[in-house]
Amino acid sequence: EQMNAARALFAEDSCVYTLRQLKKHLTQKLAWSRGAANAGALALMEEGPVVSVRHETYYRGQKAEPVLVEYRDEALTDADGKSEPACLQKALPGDLYEAFRGPDRFVVNRFVRHTKLRWLVRLQEHAEGFYTMVTENAYEPIFFRVPDVQKPRPQSNTVYEIEVDEAAEKAGDPLADYEDYVMENWERYGYRNFTWPARIVRRVARADDPLGALRIAEERHGSRTVFPDEVKDEAKDVPQEVTASQRRGRVDLRDVPFVTIDGEDARDFDDAVYCEKSGDGWRLLVAIADVSQYVKPDHPLDREAQARGTSVYFPTAVIPMLPEALSNGICSLNPNVDRLTMVCDALLDAEGKPTAYQFDPAVLCSHARRTYTQVWSALSGEDAGFEALGERLFEVERLYELYKVLHAAREKRFALDFESSEIKARIDEEKGTIDRFEPYRITDANRLIEECMLVANVAAADFVLRNERLTLFRVHDKPEEERLQDLRRILRAYKLKLRENSPAGFAALLESVKKSPSTSPLQIAVLRTMSRALYSPDNIGHYGLQYGHYAHFTSPIRRYPDLLLHRTIKAILAKRTYHPKLYSESGIEGFHALKLGFRPAFEKPVKELSKTARDHEVWRRLGLLCSIAERRADDASRDVMNWLACEWLSKRPNERYASTVVNVLD
């Protein structure tokens, strides 16, 4: 009877057990005595089923089957996201293994394959005469060595691309005693685990010069710096003037005095605005460059734009999503030339609430290009600003009146509002190094344009939802409880409180923070509490902006999700449904993919899904692709800025600066 109870216990079990684990399981689950558990475990092992894994015998639950697991960050994770600690002496991040589930860990049965063989590394020479290479593009340390015949002349701060030598790995390490030496002395030299045989593919750059730092950041985060020839050829063929046939069927808004307002160093102008009074409320027109007119699905330009996902901005350079012929040319709303646009024409009531809107393909001619500095100077009553705006002053003043209404509406809905102050690096163009740092103040001129863009973005999301179509929404989830607890601990040190976990609670907290002498670190702490916004076809609203629906419509020159949204809207206007293509999933990988819950090895191929599921899954994976591209771009920009700042400080060893610690990284 007891053995029948034991067999029934394991009838639905999907784990494997050692003899010791089997005894413990019987004791805990069936309340057997130690003696009975010992006898029962031995009997079960005798009758089976059992499986032998690496010279050890395991009792196999009736539902126990091998599963695919991925190794990363000293843990193994299966397709369901279950993760267990693992210490493998010989494993690269992303390696796949076949394993059985155990009661407290995965039992590795066999190695399946590496998912990544090429790495960026810095070469290091040791006094004992051997070389190692430490990775630049992994989030945990890995060590490589190269054959004697290939060892380059050691160059400190030089980054190389290397490839794991699978043949040498499979043949066994010819330097077995070398590995033993490393393992015995890992504490002395910083080694851990296996030192991989590898070959040098190419030298990337030196890390101690500005162009090298930029190149390394591009490589480390997968930025595509050179456009393929087929993309360049297609860009060359794009006409640089709007033709009569292209104007046909579009709303003609060339007489409307649109203006573009951007930063002084902006080169691509993808939005223009105009507003006028309408009864007690307002009419706002937001015109956005119609990139979809020139970037067609399944063409080289579109394939490359999707692979890039976004433009990447560095202090010294820009890696554009689209070639310059489009981004700074025919798609840029330069003044006094005709341009094709998608226009959001919105009516707002006296409190700034949208009452109606429509989207139209249009042609316009920007009447002026002005800068944030010029606009703010005029709005502040300065003569220089009045002179710079000229005859456009009246339109800008009207926009400012509307901004005040929209800003008041923002405060009423408790949208999060962080005091924005940025530090701009001024670059010595000849040397490519930082000449100085300057504070860059965000003024109402910047916020004016931002609020206009928000109106268009919300209307675009609403338009898609009302027409029951799929697109990529910009979604932002509420903060996680664990992060809230961390924030509360920080606030206690400053005698501050988050009185309630709600938009109103955060709005009140941010007002208190603004009055604190420690405004900057506290704002950073609040910001880090927030979830990161991302792109998804599943609308959950935007917590930070306090919108029930939101999407990115206003920057198709530099963001691929905006281009997808334009195509969706155009298809709706034409009474069609837009079905995008996912050209490659190679960008949905790495650290950020894992953080977003996507594990390529465990994902079902899109082509194997039903038509309905396939459409949604393509949108989902496009959202992941674009979210990851955005985060990689942020990482790359931050890397270069940090390097330039450190390089600037290294030239000033005797200078002192007042500073505040805002985060501990390690």
Q: Whereabouts are the PLM-identified features?
A:
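Charge-lined substrate channels and their catalytic hotspots, especially those that engage the 3′ end
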Residues: 1-285, 292-337, 369-370, 374-377, ...
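Residues that form generic nucleotide/phosphate-binding pockets
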Residues: 9, 25, 203, 217-221, ...
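Residue-level signal for secondary-structure boundary elements
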Residues: 14, 18, 49-52, 172, ...
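Structured C-terminal cores of nucleic-acid metabolism proteins
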Residues: 35, 459, 477, 482-487, ...
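Extended, compositionally biased low-complexity polar/Lys-Gly-rich tracts
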Residues: 80-81, 188-228, 398-402, 443, ...
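Feature marking long nucleic-acid-engaging regions of large polymerase/nuclease enzymes
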Residues: 84, 168, 262-481, 489-496, ...
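Acidic/polar residues at beta-strand termini and the immediately following turn/coil
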Residues: 135, 349, 428, 663-665
